[in-house]
């Protein structure tokens, strides 16, 4: 992968298959802090490089590498995500940029 400015937000789809219900709940609660729930075990997120790394690190600490699976699909620059998404059925709403309170 090429070098990416860490402050440039990208749109991600994060999908996971977690074998243990307790770990699944921990992953779900973590993901609520990083993105918008789309459907069972699927979130959409707008993340800069630092938040992507932080999210991946937390998820890595929660999952069992032998039985669980987390996919982070980079859809590209967040401002252009509408061009890359096709939705069937219920309308897909892209995640708008929101102010972050630190």
UniProtKB/Swiss-Prot annotation:
Example GO BP: defense response to virus
Keyword set includes Signal: no
Cofactor(s) annotated in UniProt: Mg(2+)
Binding locations of Mg(2+): 17
One term of GO molecular function: metal ion binding
SUPFAM superfamilies: TTP0101/SSO1404-like
Residues forming coiled coils: none
Keyword Metal-binding listed: yes
Entry EC no(s): 3.1.-.-
Keywords, ordered alphabetically: Antiviral defense, Endonuclease, Hydrolase, Magnesium, Metal-binding, Nuclease
Record InterPro entries: CRISPR_associated_Cas2 (IPR021127), Virulence_VapD/CRISPR_Cas2 (IPR019199)
Top enzyme category: hydrolase
Role played: CRISPR (clustered regularly interspaced short palindromic repeat), is an adaptive immune system that provides protection against mobile genetic elements (viruses, transposable elements and conjugative plasmids). CRISPR clusters contain sequences complementary to antecedent mobile elements and target invading nucleic acids. CRISPR clusters are transcribed and processed into CRISPR RNA (crRNA). Functions as a ssRNA-specific endoribonuclease. Involved in the integration of spacer DNA into the CRISPR cassette.
Annotated family: Belongs to the CRISPR-associated endoribonuclease Cas2 protein family.
NCBIfam families to which the protein is assigned, alphabetical: cas2 (TIGR01573)
SUBUNIT field: Homodimer, forms a heterotetramer with a Cas1 homodimer.
PANTHER family: CRISPR-ASSOCIATED ENDORIBONUCLEASE CAS2, CRISPR-ASSOCIATED ENDORIBONUCLEASE CAS2 3
Protein name, UniProt field: CRISPR-associated endoribonuclease Cas2 1
Provenance organism: Rhodospirillum rubrum (strain ATCC 11170 / ATH 1.1.1 / DSM 467 / LMG 4362 / NCIMB 8255 / S1)
């Amino acid at each position: 992968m090429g070098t990416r400015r860490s402050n440039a937000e990208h749109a991600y789809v994060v999908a996971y298959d977690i074998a243990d219900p307790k770990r699944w709940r921990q992953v779900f609660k973590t993901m609520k802090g990083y993105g918008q729930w789309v459907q069972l075990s699927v979130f959409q997120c707008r993340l800069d490089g630092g938040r992507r790394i932080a999210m991946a690190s937390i998820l890595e600490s929660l999952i069992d590498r032998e039985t669980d699976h987390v996919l982070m699909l980079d859809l590209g620059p967040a401002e252009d995500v509408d061009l890359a998404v096709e939705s069937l059925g219920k309308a897909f709403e892209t995640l708008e940029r929101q102010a972050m309170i630190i």
